[in-house]
């Protein structure tokens, strides 16, 4: 989550909370998952507190802020409620993500270019908490330029279209978009992270891209953990990223 010469792994624990909320139980505990992830080599922990509270709850975020040994990457929509909460929690990293249809691009990233004044105000306000603010956007030059204009020091490129690509041609096209987006972002002085839909069979090509600071991965880790345990799932992903990014 901080700029590094080696590629970092941010572990998203949202779907541990999804499993808990499915039955309204106290288990499985996303905080325990976060601590296990750190032990297994995670460089940071990502959580998304959604307006509908479908997985992570405020209490999870408060507890994580107190116990994490790495850093929290707090994903949030651009709302007054979330801004006030972030100001109270003061996470090390904040990533602004789309939550409503109006904020989405067709690909699924935040439409920064279409709402620059609103995003600029949010970035400036959140930066005053001391957080490094990033924007979850498509690997699109227009959105990357807008991200720089609004003052965000970092971006997270949306890798969902690459993850969803089915034919070798589509995969190559989407990977090329990411490669070009990374180069364009780095060229504009931005810290470039990436994530969404990455799993054990598609992560290596993205991890091999020079210039990416961190990959944020969640659902694939939680799914694999059902069979191998959470620490092993994280360690396996970390090893893939380290090997591919050498």
Swiss-Prot record:
EC number: 2.6.99.2
Alphabetized GO MF terms: pyridoxine 5'-phosphate synthase activity
Active site: residue positions: 48, 75, 196
Keywords on record: Cytoplasm, Pyridoxine biosynthesis, Transferase
Top EC group: transferase
Entry binding sites for 3-amino-2-oxopropyl phosphate: 12, 23, 197, 218-219
Location(s), subcellular: Cytoplasm
Pfam families documented for this protein: PdxJ (PF03740)
Main location: cytoplasm
Keyword ATP-binding: no
Reactions it catalyzes: 3-amino-2-oxopropyl phosphate + 1-deoxy-D-xylulose 5-phosphate = pyridoxine 5'-phosphate + phosphate + 2 H2O + H(+)
Binding locations of 1-deoxy-D-xylulose 5-phosphate: 14-15, 50, 55, 105
Quaternary structure annotation from Swiss-Prot or TrEMBL: Homooctamer; tetramer of dimers.
Physiological role: Catalyzes the complicated ring closure reaction between the two acyclic compounds 1-deoxy-D-xylulose-5-phosphate (DXP) and 3-amino-2-oxopropyl phosphate (1-amino-acetone-3-phosphate or AAP) to form pyridoxine 5'-phosphate (PNP) and inorganic phosphate.
Similarity-based family: Belongs to the PNP synthase family.
Protein name: Pyridoxine 5'-phosphate synthase
Species for this entry: Pseudomonas putida (strain ATCC 47054 / DSM 6125 / CFBP 8728 / NCIMB 11950 / KT2440)
Origin organism lineage: Bacteria, Pseudomonadati, Pseudomonadota, Gammaproteobacteria, Pseudomonadales
Gene: pdxJ
């Amino acid at each position: 989550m901080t700029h590094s010469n080696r590629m970092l792994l941010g572990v998203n624990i949202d779907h541990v909370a999804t499993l808990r909320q499915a039955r309204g139980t106290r288990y499985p505990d996303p905080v325990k998952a976060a601590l296990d992830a750190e032990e297994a080599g995670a460089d940071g922990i990502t959580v998304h507190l959604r307006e509908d509270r479908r997985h992570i709850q405020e209490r999870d975020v408060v507890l994580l802020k107190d116990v994490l040994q790495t850093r929290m990457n707090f994903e949030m929509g651009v709302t007054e409620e979330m801004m006030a909460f972030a100001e109270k929690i003061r996470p090390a990293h904040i990533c602004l993500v789309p939550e409503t249809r109006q904020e989405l691009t067709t690909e699924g990233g935040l439409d920064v270019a279409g709402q620059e004044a609103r995003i600029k105000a949010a970035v400036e306000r959140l930066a005053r908490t001391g957080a490094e603010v990033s924007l979850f956007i498509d690997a699109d030059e227009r959105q990357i330029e807008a991200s720089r204009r609004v003052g965000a020091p970092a971006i997270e490129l949306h890798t969902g279209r690459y993850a969803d690509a089915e034919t070798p041609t589509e995969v190559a096209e989407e990977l090329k978009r990411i490669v070009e987006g990374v180069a364009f972002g780095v060229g504009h002085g931005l810290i470039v992270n990436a994530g969404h839909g990455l799993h054990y069979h598609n992560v290596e090509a993205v991890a091999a891209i020079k210039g990416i600071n961190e990959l944020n991965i969640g659902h694939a880790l939680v799914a694999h953990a059902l069979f191998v345990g959470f620490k092993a799932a994280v360690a396996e992903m970390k090893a893939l990223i380290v090997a591919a990014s050498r």
